[in-house]
Amino acid sequence: MSDFESALSKYPETPLERELLGAAMLYSSGPTGRPKGIVRPLPEQSPEEPLPVIGFLSGLWRYREDMIYLSPAPLYHSAPQAAVGLTLRMGGTVVIMERFDPADYLRFVEEYQVSHSQLVP
């Protein structure tokens, strides 16, 4: 049994009575320059229900189950974090670069047959 399975076995298998969808905790340095978690209200829906924004963004960016998203940016930023989360929610594959390097980026696009990515000019 793996460590994950062992840890998981300590919790009940029955679902929570009223399980709600979670939300990402984003951080801002604000005026102090110190990280501060931005607490947002949780959506009043179950994890099985898609958020309305999912349909909009998946149509806009053509996210789909067979997509491969390459993330060259740090995941503490809201844009790459949102793109990675949406890719996973749609059933796609995510490739994350440890740090951006133009040559590595182009190599990854070819090696992983990347269909989606997000770059800053």
What are these regions (language model features)?
Residues 16-17, 37, 66, 84:
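Secondary-structure boundary/capping residues
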